[in-house]
């Protein structure tokens, strides 16, 4: 099977005053095309830092992060921006929606860096994206008019409208109640299967991790794969 990610000896070191903190420590990992891997671990043990490295939001202090053979740490800022805009979709715990934009406008904003086709085509794509997450009737609503679960559905539509190869999700259900959590994870699993996405999902929730094909645990910056 084709490898989408290959990480070799990846470390990330930050300075905290007079001391250094190794948030990610010598991680080796491969992720196959179309695979779903869940990363678990306690707060502050490097999960989100690892996801930032996978998404090109940060560069490793040492080691290599290859995405489809391209070394993300060696790409220019402009090249990384292009990769993030086309190949990777991001979903965050706090939704990261623009409060003054409607659901449809928040989703459409993801197409702006791509200079996607005309307004009519963008609107059609936005409508299809919102329909795919069950929010066709909420297109004109502001985030403040939506529940937490609905806001996360908008965020999922925004991540997927670019038709990325990779979906990176950082605690996507952390702000949701148990029932809504189950609905959002079921939706993500459905979209993952339908679209053949490569999904890396960070969560402290064991119930979510059990749905993934593989699970890894981060502890003090070290990654251990579980069967």
Regions found by a protein language model. Give the residues of each.
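Short, low-complexity, intrinsically disordered N-terminal peptides in bacterial proteins
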Residues: 1-2, 227
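ABC family nucleotide-binding domain
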Residues: 4-219
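Conserved switch/coupling elements of ABC/ABC-like ATPase nucleotide-binding domains
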Residues: 220-226
